[in-house]
Regions:
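Second-shell loop/turn segments in exported
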Residues: 33-36, 76-84, 102-106, 114-118, ...
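Active-site SXXK
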Residues: 71, 82-106, 119, 252
């Protein structure tokens, strides 16, 4: 099966306006920050936000960036520290389901395909629970993943279904787990890798490309966001296009979680999403120094 790349086209005017306003209000100069290593750039950026009170002492962050052309990890901050997973756990549920399909224990037909699309593209919690039920529920699903894919779920904690209100706070994962999953996925080492990539490329909101002003139109993205009143995150693969006609894939994973439930969900999640976009901007500029990108 061939992978069909699905570029996500941003709303250019809104993206430019939003990015400009955020830059003026909260972001340090990215052009001035690209001289050091990417890890130190990200660390410095987050520390500057903390110093201004834009990220509070109740919030924790974790980041991982990997160049898939060379396999080099370019940034690792709190890589193995468990953070709230939110919907970023859903690609792992897809993996467990497709493992059972490959084993001949489940069928992947029109109904299950629709549930899978709703789970990944729309983050539908009812479909998420349906998928998890097929693999035996939270405990059995975690056991399956730990048995067959131990290197992908070292810090994964799967203990609950997703309630209708979406307030599931006890499932955990680390940015290291997400990056390991995405690396294996890109290398086609997982069952139904092409289908999982297709699902993660379906059009939808993301925090890695859309409204990230330094990333050019036509960059392909495969991702899954996670959002609760205690977590804002995104895990994804971006495929940058080079001026030489080659493609340069890389992973960006960012998670910001709060130890307390925030009261103003809308504004909190929007501002944290913009922080992740700025880290994605930093990453693209760093990759542009490594390769002849557009």
């Amino acid at each position: 099966m061939c992978i069909v790349l699905h570029p996500r086209i941003p709303h250019f005017f809104l993206a430019t306006l939003t990015a400009a306003l955020f830059t003026l209000s909260s972001a340090p100069s990215i052009r001035a920050a690209v001289d050091g290593s990417l890890g130190s750039q990200i660390d410095g950026y987050i520390k500057s936000l903390r110093a201004r009170g834009s990220i509070s002492g109740n919030e924790r962050t974790a980041w991982l960036v990997r160049d898939l052309t060379t396999g080099t990890t370019l940034a690792s901050i709190n890589e193995n520290s468990p953070r709230q997973a939110a919907s970023m756990i859903k690609p792992f549920l897809a993996l467990a389901f497709f493992h059972q399909v490959k084993a001949g224990k489940l069928l992947y037909g029109p109904s299950s395909r629709r549930h899978m699309e709703l789970m990944i593209q729309k983050s539908d919690n009812g479909s998420t629970n349906w998928v998890m039920q097929q693999t035996g529920g939270p405990t059995a699903t975690k056991a399956l993943l730990a048995r067959h894919y131990p290197s992908l779920c070292r810090n994964l904690r799967l203990v609950e279904y997703i309630p209708s209100n979406g307030r599931a706070y006890r499932n955990l994962g680390s940015v290291g787990d997400y990056a390991s999953f995405l690396t294996a996925l890109w290398k086609k080492q997982l069952p139904y890798s092409d289908e999982i990539l297709r699902l993660m490329a379906l059009p939808g909101p993301d925090r890695l490309y859309t409204k990230a002003r330094h990333i050019p139109s036509g960059t392909h993205v495969y991702d899954k966001t996670g959002s609760t009143a205690m977590c804002c995150g995104d895990m994804g693969i971006l495929v940058a296009q080079g001026t030489n006609g080659r493609s340069y894939p890389y992973i960006v994973v960012g998670v910001i979680d709060s130890v307390v439930r925030v009261s103003s969900y809308g504004s909190w999640i929007s501002r944290r999403a913009d922080v992740i976009r700025e880290v994605s901007n930093l990453t693209y500029l760093h990759m542009k120094k490594r390769y002849p990108l557009r």
